A protein has these predicted regions:
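Acidic, glycine-enriched catalytic cores built around paired aspartates
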Residues: 152, 156-182
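Active-site capping/gating regions of soluble enzymes
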Residues: 1-150, 156
Length: 182
């Protein structure tokens, strides 16, 4: 479970998928796409990226994984099909896009769509994570975003508009004051 063992190849992450559910209904996406409450959750998670990274990446080799072109997050923003973002929303799994079939091209039969399974993915943690603090932090960050009045505006502002960091300064960029959503 080492985060990175080979230079030039993707490391091993511990991506955390989150779902908002109440009364057996998933509130991450609806028939149109991502919901406003999901965007607020994302804003909360990104607003607390510093703390979540500290809990999710606890050893020096954790940061060797977080470099460009290694299928790891290198931008503090969110998006749907971009693996370089800190928070990814795999919206392609909703019924109208047929991402399931694209991801499984060898599948001969029809791939059933299972509604209500949409998630939001935090991509930075790895096997070194302090899981108890990380999960508590994610819950509190999500709650903070959902309750914040300006979270929707912040989420819309930072979709695919992250701060791009070189591999040598990703940690500094992530932990700097620039990243804090203001």
């Amino acid at each position: 479970f080492a985060p990175k063992i080979t230079v030039g190849k993707a490391g091993s992450g511990l991506h955390i998928h989150m779902m908002l559910e109440k009364d057996d209904k998933n509130y991450i996406a609806d028939d149109v796409g991502l919901t406003n409450i999901a965007k607020k959750l994302i804003a909360g998670v990104l607003g607390h990226a510093q703390s979540l990274t500290a809990f999710g990446n606890t050893i020096p080799t954790s940061y060797l994984r977080l470099v460009p072109h290694q299928e790891a997050p290198t931008m503090v923003c969110w998006g749907d099909s971009n693996r370089s973002v800190l928070v990814r929303v795999p919206l392609g799994w909703i019924a109208k896009t047929n991402m399931i079939k694209d991801a499984n091209p060898q599948e001969r039969g029809s791939v059933p769509y299972i509604p209500g399974k949409q998630t939001v993915e935090l991509r930075s943690p790895d096997g070194s994570a302090d899981l108890y603090h990380l999960m508590a932090g994610i819950i509190l960050a999500a709650k903070d975003g959902i309750l914040a009045e300006d979270a929707l505006e912040k989420a819309n502002k930072i979709k695919n508009a992250g701060i791009k960091c070189s591999q040598s300064i990703f940690l500094n960029c992530l932990l700097s004051e620039i990243v804090v959503l203001t």
